[in-house]
Amino acid sequence: MNLKGLDNDEIIKLLEENKIEVKDFIDSSICPTCFDKENNNIIYGNKKDVMLYEDNDIECFLISNPRSNGHIVISSIVHYKDMMEIPDELCEKVFVFAKLMMNIIKNVYDCESVYLCT
């Protein structure tokens, strides 16, 4: 569903009615992590209980509405419009961290494979 042109209240209502999901934000060029932070954790829920890692650059947390067991979000603390804007050092940090987390998830959940989506 295209969310462009909708105000926050309309988007929040659609979320509460389970009529949209994270992919709808991404498809509409709306950062779901920023929307979540700006709207009282409406998408991912209270991250304090599920925060796996946080530092000055990145955060990693389990989401409250996972697509599968072990579904995590790794995001930069600073918002970037797209990956082209991310400084190389931060991009490297995110991907090295993602690889570490993918190995942990694979072992914890005995997965055959783990996927990284941007």
Protein language model features and the residues they cover:
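Short histidine-centered catalytic/ligand-binding loop motif
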Residues: 72-95
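Active-site microenvironments that recognize anionic phosphate/pyrophosphate groups
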Residues: 1-80
